[in-house]
């Protein structure tokens, strides 16, 4: 059970009183209201290729963004200079700019009664000492060595390991003050199999908030090598209309299209293909898609949103029915709805499709002829109409089994139909902020080459 806290940690390197002073200075300069967002970030990244170090990059910096409101006009400015004189100049510039821009009828801070006053502890920082470059390089080396040991791997694009930590704090002139720290680790490897023009490339990666949740480097490497070798000697296929199965490495992208379509700003502008579908069946019965900002150690977790509003778990698709938009303050006001704690810009948090009942093997067992996709190319998705067309490669399914690799295909459909004809497997993993298990979609069009 998450434990609520009322006192956010002070960001390192800055006194929280400075942010409170900014609010006072903004009011004194003529602003009706204001908000300040502070970020202190640190990162370290290393990469190696064929056993030799290729990259070592580290950074540390602070950034402050101030947004001032004069009536229904607002302006945002940012600075990395925290000297008092520079901050006062920043305030004056923000207020002057706000006076000069057109009015936005939907602009403004959240009412004080809606602001978050307590929030859960989400375990977003493992509090380890920052890893050294040598430690990260050892992770990358282990991953690449494991990949190159896979029979059939002939070359490497390298392996990369990185660490980051960010401390964020938000203060508003009407009483909100909150902050939290987020850590992150990532490891990736990409290799080639085969020779000459018959080479094939693939990869594996892992990201986590805690180091202990990162995939073992040797497994990252072995997977990358195995995936690349499995793509060798692809065949072409003829045009067809068949079931298409998306490997779970790709299936989260389908949810990305959904998140874009239910973003309140697009709905308010009338540019979403789902704009008229609230409360309707857009997936099959039994399908549930969740936005959960309170997932422990979640890569998209957040105790409050970018506008100081409380966050909570929501089933945006429940039993196949669309139940909510993802709303920040501006889009909520425009649509005359309550905000959902997805500010700013209506972005999701940990967005995932709940797992189904069948294993991936069982999901394809009754497919006489079909396509199992392991890679997608291009971005041919129209968010206004839902039309979908992308290049693809993967494996041909024959009599319920992955039979041989295929490439040079184009798959096409419309997201409205694809959503309705989607069936999830039971292999959900949380590898990013948007996740889905392997999914099967009936009746997609395939064009060979």
Region spans (language model):
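Active-site bordering "gate/hinge" segments
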Residues: 1-302, 306-309, 318-321, 401, ...
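Dual-mode signal for accessory low-complexity, basic/Gly-rich regions
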Residues: 277-449
């Amino acid at each position: 059970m998450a434990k609520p806290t009322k006192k956010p940690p002070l960001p390192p390197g800055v006194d929280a009183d400075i942010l409170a002073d900014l609010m006072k200075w903004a009011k004194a300069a003529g602003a009706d209201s204001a908000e300040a967002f502070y970020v202190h970030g640190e990162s370290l990244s290393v990469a190696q290729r064929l056993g030799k170090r290729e990259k070592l990059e580290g950074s540390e910096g602070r950034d402050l963004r101030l947004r001032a409101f004069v009536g229904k006009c607002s302006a945002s400015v940012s600075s990395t200079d925290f000297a008092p004189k520079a901050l006062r100049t920043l305030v004056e510039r923000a207020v002057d700019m706000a006076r000069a821009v057109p009015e936005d009828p939907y602009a403004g801070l959240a009412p004080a009664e809606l602001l978050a006053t307590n929030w859960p502890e989400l375990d977003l920082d493992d509090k380890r000492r920052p890893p050294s470059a040598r430690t990260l390089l050892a992770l990358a080396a282990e991953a690449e060595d494991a990949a190159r040991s896979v029979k059939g791997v002939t070359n490497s694009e390298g392996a990369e390991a990185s660490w980051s930590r960010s401390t964020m704090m938000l203060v508003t002139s009407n009483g909100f003050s909150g902050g939290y720290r987020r850590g992150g680790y990532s490891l990736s490897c990409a290799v080639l199999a085969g020779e000459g023009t018959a080479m094939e490339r693939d990869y594996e990666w892992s990201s986590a908030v805690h180091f202990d949740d990162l995939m073992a480097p040797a497994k990252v490497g072995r997977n990358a090598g195995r995936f690349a070798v499995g793509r060798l000697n692809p065949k072409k296929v003829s045009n067809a209309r068949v079931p298409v199965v998306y490997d779970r490495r790709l299936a989260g992208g389908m949810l990305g299209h959904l998140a874009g379509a239910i973003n309140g700003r697009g709905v308010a502008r009338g540019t979403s293909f789902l704009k008229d579908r609230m409360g309707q069946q857009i997936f099959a019965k039994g399908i549930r898609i969740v936005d959960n900002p309170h997932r422990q150690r979640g890569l998209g977790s957040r105790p409050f949103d970018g506008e100081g509003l409380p966050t909570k778990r929501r089933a945006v698709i429940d039993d196949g029915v669309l139940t909510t938009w993802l709303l920040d303050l501006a889009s909520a006001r425009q649509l005359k709805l309550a905000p959902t704690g997805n500010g700013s810009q209506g972005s999701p948090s940990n967005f995932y499709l709940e797992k189904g009942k069948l294993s991936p093997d069982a999901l394809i067992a009754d497919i006489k002829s079909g396509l199992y996709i392991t890679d997608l190319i291009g971005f041919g998705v129209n968010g206004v109409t839902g039309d979908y067309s992308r290049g693809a490669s993967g494996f041909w399914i024959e009599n319920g089994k992955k039979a041989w690799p295929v490439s040079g295909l184009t798959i096409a459909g419309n997201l409205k139909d694809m959503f309705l004809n989607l069936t999830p497997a039971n292999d959900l993993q949380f590898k990013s902020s948007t996740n889905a298990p392997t999914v099967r979609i009936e009746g997609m069009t395939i064009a060979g080459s």
